Design a protein with these regions (language model features):
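C-terminal transmembrane helix and the adjacent membrane-cytosol boundary/short C-terminal tail
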Residues: 2-10, 86, 134, 170-185, ...
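Short membrane-interfacial helix/loop motifs at transmembrane-helix boundaries
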Residues: 21-55, 226-231, 283
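Interhelical loop and adjacent transmembrane-helix boundary motif
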Residues: 2-4, 48-56, 219-276
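Periplasmic/extracellular loop-to-transmembrane helix junction in inner-membrane transport proteins
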Residues: 4, 35-71, 245-246
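Transmembrane-helix boundary motif in ABC transporter permease subunits
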Residues: 1-5, 70-101, 114, 118-121, ...
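Hydrophobic alpha-helical transmembrane segments of multipass integral membrane proteins
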Residues: 58, 62, 66-78, 82, ...
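Membrane-interfacial helix termini and adjacent extracytoplasmic/periplasmic loops
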Residues: 36-41, 45-46, 50, 110-158, ...
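Transmembrane alpha-helices
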Residues: 11, 16-23, 103, 107, ...
C-alpha cells in the first residue's frame, strides 16, 4: 500500500514538472540579460522596458484589454439573463438549451473560429451590397466599409464567453429560495425591484465568477481571434504568434510572462471566491440543521 502511494506521488510530481517546468523556464529567461536562450548572463528588466516602446505590442494590449472588458461585461449580462431564463423552463426544454449552450465549450476552437469567420464574412458582404444598392438608387454614398475587425472580434468573444457565465450563474439559481421574490412582491415591491434588490444580490457570487472567467478566456484566446479579427486588428496572443514566426525574441518571454501572471491572478481570485462561497454555504446548511434539531 505504501509502495503504491509512493509511486503515485512520484507520478504526480513528474506530471507537474512536465506541465510547469517550461513555464518556469520561460519566466526565468524573461529576466535574462542575453538573447541566448541557453545561457544565463545576468538579471535585467530591459526586455519588459522594450515592450513599452513597442507600438505593435501596446496596440495589441489596448485591443486585448478593450475586447476582454467589453466582452466580459456583455457576456455577463446576456449569460445572467439566459441562466435565469433556462432555470425558469421546464425540464426537457432546459435540458435541450443547456445542451446547445455546451456546444461552444466542447467544440474545437478552430471549428468555432472558422464558422464565425464565415458568418461574419457573409453578413459584411450583405451590408456592403446594401450600401452599394442604396448609393446606386439615391446617389448618396455612405462612407462605410464593413469588414472583419474590432467589432467582429468583440462579437466572437461575446459568443464563446456567454456559456461560461451561464454555467457560473446556474448553481446560484439552484440554491436560490424561489419564495424570496414572491415575498418581496407581497411586501409591496414591483417585479423589477424584487429582481434587482432580492434576486440579483443572491446571484452576485456566480455573476462575478462568470465575469472573471469570461475576461480570462478573452485575454487568453488565440484561435478564434485569429479567424475573426481581420487583417487590421491584433490582440496580444496574435501578436506573440506573429513575433514567434519571425524570430524568437526575449520580448516574447516577457509578454508571455505578463499574460501568464494576469491569467494566474484571475484564476486564483476565482478559486478563492469559490472556496469561500462553498464554506459560506456549508455554514448556512449547518446552521439550518442545528436550528431544525432544536
Amino acid at each position: 500500500m505504501r509502495k503504491a502511494l509512493g509511486i503515485s506521488r512520484i507520478y504526480n510530481i513528474l506530471v507537474y514538472i512536465f506541465l510547469y517546468a517550461p513555464i518556469l523556464v520561460l519566466i526565468i529567461f524573461s529576466f535574462n540579460d542575453s538573447k541566448n536562450r541557453a545561457v544565463w548572463s545576468g538579471f535585467t528588466l530591459h526586455w519588459y522596458v522594450d515592450l513599452l516602446h513597442n507600438d505593435a505590442i501596446i496596440n495589441a494590449f489596448i485591443v486585448t484589454l478593450g475586447v476582454s472588458v467589453l466582452a466580459a461585461l456583455v457576456a455577463t449580462v446576456f449569460g445572467t439573463l439566459a441562466a435565469i431564463g433556462f432555470f425558469s423552463m421546464r425540464r426537457k426544454p432546459r435540458a435541450f438549451f443547456m445542451g446547445v449552450n455546451n456546444i461552444p465549450m466542447t467544440n474545437a476552437d478552430i471549428i468555432t473560429g472558422v464558422s464565425l469567420m464565415l458568418l461574419f464574412v457573409f453578413f459584411t458582404q450583405i451590408l456592403n451590397d446594401l450600401v452599394y444598392f442604396v448609393g446606386m438608387q439615391t446617389g448618396f454614398w455612405l462612407p462605410v466599409d464593413f469588414h472583419l475587425g474590432f467589432i467582429t472580434l468583440l462579437l466572437a468573444h461575446i459568443t464563446f464567453d456567454t456559456p461560461y457565465v451561464i454555467l457560473s450563474v446556474l448553481p446560484c439559481l439552484r440554491q436560490l429560495d424561489k419564495n424570496l421574490s414572491e415575498a418581496a412582491q407581497d411586501l409591496g415591491a414591483t417585479p423589477m425591484q424584487a429582481f434587482t434588490k432580492v434576486v440579483l444580490p443572491q446571484l452576485r457570487p456566480g455573476i462575478i465568477n462568470g465575469a472573471i472567467i469570461a475576461f480570462t478566456m478573452s485575454v487568453d484566446d488565440f484561435v478564434i481571434s485569429y479567424f475573426t479579427a481581420g487583417a487590421d486588428v491584433s490582440n496580444l496572443a496574435m501578436e506573440v504568434y506573429s513575433m514567434a514566426r519571425r524570430h524568437i525574441s526575449p520580448e516574447i518571454n516577457a509578454i508571455s510572462t505578463i499574460l501568464f501572471t494576469i491569467v494566474m491572478i484571475l484564476l486564483i481570485v476565482i478559486n478563492v471566491r469559490s472556496i469561500r462561497q462553498e464554506q459560506a454555504e456549508a455554514k448556512r446548511l449547518h446552521a439550518l440543521q442545528r436550528d431544525a434539531s432544536r
